[in-house]
Amino acid sequence: MKTKCETIRNIAIIAHVDHGKTTLVDELLKQSGIFRQNQEVAERVMDSNDIERERGITILAKNTAVYYNGVKINIIDTPGHADFGGEVERVLKMVNGVILVVDAFEGPMPQTKFVLKKALELNLPVIVCVNKIDRPEARPAEVIDEVLELFIDLDASDEQLDCPFVFASAKAGVAILELSDTPQSMKPLFETILDYIPAPEGDEEAGTQVLISTIDYNEYVGRIGVGKVDNGKIRVNQEVVVVNAHEPDKKRKVKVSKLYEFEGLKKVEVTEASVGSIVAISGITDIHIGDTLCSPENPQPIPFQKISEPTIAMHFIVNDSPLAGKEGKFVTSRHLRERLFKELNTDVSLRVEETDSTESFKVSGRGELHLSVLIENMRREGFEFAVSKAEVLYREDENGKKLEPMEKAYVDVPDEFSGTVIEKLSNRKGELLSMSTASSGYTRLEFSIPSRGLIGYRGEFMTDTKGNGILNTIFDGYGPYKGDIAYRKQGSLIAFESGEAITYGLFNAQERGTLFISPGEKVYSGMVVGQNGKAEDVEINVCKKKQLTNTRSSSADEALRLTPPRILSLEQALEFIETDELLEVTPKSLRIRKKILDPLMRKRANRTN
């Protein structure tokens, strides 16, 4: 018989990037007494990955737990970006309700829509937390209306529309239920969670059922499965059967060697866990997301939503440039292969395939951000490699027609730039679905656009809107192929010879376009050192020295004025490269180069193409 476990609440937090979700969790941890008074708490405690802290994005779902009035509240932090949507769908299976965190000025954002839609489809109750109410430009009353409009757009039920609103300033550590209340602490939010989020249900007397929803990885114990106990109990040394709903015939017996629950930010070893508990289980080799751990007497897998398929792919290639091996610690194909396959332990939305060449691996993911985060992580770990331009993964329908991944693009731009943005996105096969003007002088545009139309567009968008535009995208399924798109109108400036860049050579080269390098930098033949002002590629000699005579002294070089080079970030470089180019990634440098370095062989290849 199913019973409610009143001492547990399982909730997920949904929020757009930078709306204060992680700060809110930090405050709940502090005010529930998880940290000692004298303990230093790193800001953004939930974002444990360096890139997450720097970019302010959450990539991997994290688990934490706090206690309030004798009730254990398990909090799961969901990624706010659609590229990591693979994480989101699975996390929501573990919880009985969600907290939607919305900025009191910006209101609900498109990325939030993606996760919220999944939560509403699963019929989860929602608490809306309007955060940052202490911002001078906050407009909480309007934001409430916007949230309710969003709920209606997403076909929320009447019960879901009747959700509680909590107003908070996570930074100040306070929450209130009415705007007229005096803020004191986070108590109103804690109380709302206990009152509104239902306790987990399950049959304690039934056989064990634990659905693995996320995978953690630890060098010492290997793969760790994290999931909720749906029925029965699970104990250390218990024999269980691993079975997957998508392959119910494959069963194997294993033993639970260690069992953990979450307390604060730590995993705490326990001997057994009952219905509603969120547990981490180690000692089961080859455990995967979607596996159910069942008692051997009645191995019934829990139905599980398949992980979203990748939409974009890149080739990761061993670096073979003339400067290879000088800056990285891990440079061989064995290093690259091991690292990419290790990533599969924790990132289930990723695919890694071997190719005809032992030096190259095809890596597929959910979007450019997804793959760029992997590249940045590897770079920081000391890896050196090259990557190709991102390519879109096509499919065919039952009639053999070509389908391509589509995205919904939501754009907020100052009114004067809306015409430029509409023109650019239309050229990239975007279809304008709606357009509305806000009183603040901003225009909101909604487009349906092929994923390949967005590759390389973000940098252009920021330039076109002078940095004032906001562009958010969400994967929107597969649609009919929209035809060819005309891309970059500007060619590359290619180094003609290897050596060191000289001021004199750069001074002559800068007339041709924008340079990416400074004097003294090492270059090699076939390396892209700048962007041409015209459509074709041009070879230039940046190592050219001035002929010295009695009347021409080298000190005259100091009078040459160089325009500062354009330093490309990883994302900008990935956007810039063309299909015949590679991005060389090392711990210290990002260099763009032609796939074929030799100029004669390159010309021959271009002729045959």
Residue locations for each model-derived region?
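Structural and coupling elements of P-loop NTPases
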Residues: 1-609
